[in-house]
C-alpha cells in the first residue's frame, strides 16, 4: 500500500484497517469536504459513493471495520478514502511549520476523499453563502427525492446522489436552494460526456472550464478541483483561509511549496483556524 504502517486484513464481517495517525472518520466527516458520511448511534458511519454504500464501525486499536466484501473495499473504498496515499509522508514535510504541526495534532486523521465529480459540482454550488447543516440538509433532500434507493442500514434508508438525468427538468424547491437552484438546473443540462471530458483536462484547463460555468467562481472551482477531481495542488481560499494567511503568515504563504498535497494542507489549516 503506502509507506505508512497500515493493517489491512479480512475479518469475519468485512475488512479491518488500521492507520494509526492519519485516518479518523469523525475528523473527515466534520471537515466540510463531504456531506454524506453519516454518523450512527453505535459510533459507526455510513459512506455512500456512486451506487455503493458501506457501514464502517470502530475496530480494534483505533481501527475500523468496513462491512463489505474485500473486492469492494479494494476497488471502491480504498480509492474513495485515498488509503493508498502516504499522508504520514505529507505530514513529515510540514514538520518545519509550527502552525501546521499544531494542525496535524488537531486534525491529522483527515484525508482528501476521491468523490464523484458531478456530486461535488452540485454540492459546492449549494455551499455558497451557506453553513454545513443547511448544505447537508439540502443534499439529503435531493438524494431522498430524486436519487436511487441503495439499501437500509440500522433502520435508515440511503440513496444515491441524483444523476444529471434524474435532476433534469425537476422542481428542486423542496431542497430550498434559493438562488442556487437555477445554477444546479443549468448544470443538469450538460450531458455526461461534458463531465467525462472535464476529468481528462489538465489543472489549468479544468479550472477555466469550471469558472466559465454559471454559478461557479474561483473558490467553488477549486473545491471541485480538489474534492471532485482530486487535484491535490488545488488550494481553495475563502475568508477563513485568507484570514489565517494574514494572521499566521503575515499575508505571505505560497501553497506551491507543498506541491502534490497543497489541498491537504488547506484542509488541515481549516481544522486549526
Model-identified regions with their sequence ranges:
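HhH-family (HhH-GPD) DNA N-glycosylase catalytic core used in base-excision repair
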Residues: 1-271
Amino acid at each position: 500500500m503506502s509507506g505508512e504502517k497500515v493493517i489491512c486484513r479480512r475479518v469475519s464481517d468485512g475488512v479491518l484497517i488500521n492507520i494509526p495517525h492519519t485516518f479518523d472518520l469523525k475528523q473527515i466527516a466534520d471537515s466540510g469536504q463531504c456531506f454524506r458520511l453519516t454518523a450512527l448511534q453505535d459510533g459507526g458511519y455510513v459512506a455512500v459513493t456512486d451506487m455503493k454504500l458501506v457501514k464502517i464501525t470502530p475496530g480494534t486499536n483505533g481501527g475500523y471495520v468496513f462491512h463489505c466484501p474485500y473486492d469492494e473495499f479494494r476497488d471502491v473504498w480504498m480509492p474513495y478514502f485515498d488509503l493508498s496515499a502516504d499522508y504520514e509522508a505529507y505530514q513529515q514535510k510540514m514538520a518545519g511549520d509550527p502552525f501546521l504541526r499544531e494542525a496535524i495534532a488537531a486534525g491529522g486523521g483527515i484525508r482528501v476523499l476521491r468523490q464523484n465529480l458531478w456530486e461535488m459540482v452540485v454540492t459546492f454550488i449549494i455551499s455558497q453563502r451557506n453553513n454545513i447543516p443547511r448544505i447537508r440538509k439540502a443534499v439529503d433532500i435531493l438524494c431522498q427525492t430524486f436519487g436511487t434507493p441503495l439499501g437500509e442500514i440500522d433502520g435508515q434508508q440511503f440513496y444515491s446522489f441524483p444523476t444529471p438525468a434524474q435532476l433534469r427538468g425537476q422542481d428542486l424547491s423542496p431542497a430550498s436552494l434559493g438562488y442556487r437552484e437555477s445554477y444546479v438546473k443549468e448544470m443538469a443540462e450538460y450531458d455526461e460526456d461534458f463531465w467525462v471530458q472535464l476529468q481528462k483536462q489538465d489543472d489549468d484547463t479544468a479550472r477555466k472550464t469550471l469558472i466559465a460555468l454559471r454559478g461557479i467562481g474561483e473558490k467553488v472551482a477549486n473545491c471541485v478541483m480538489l474534492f471532485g477531481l482530486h487535484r491535490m495542488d488545488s488550494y481553495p481560499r475563502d475568508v477563513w483561509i485568507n484570514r489565517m494567511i494574514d494572521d499566521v503568515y503575515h499575508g505571505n504563504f505560497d501553497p506551491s511549496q507543498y506541491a502534490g498535497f497543497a489541498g491537504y494542507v488547506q484542509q488541515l489549516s481549516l481544522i486549526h483556524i
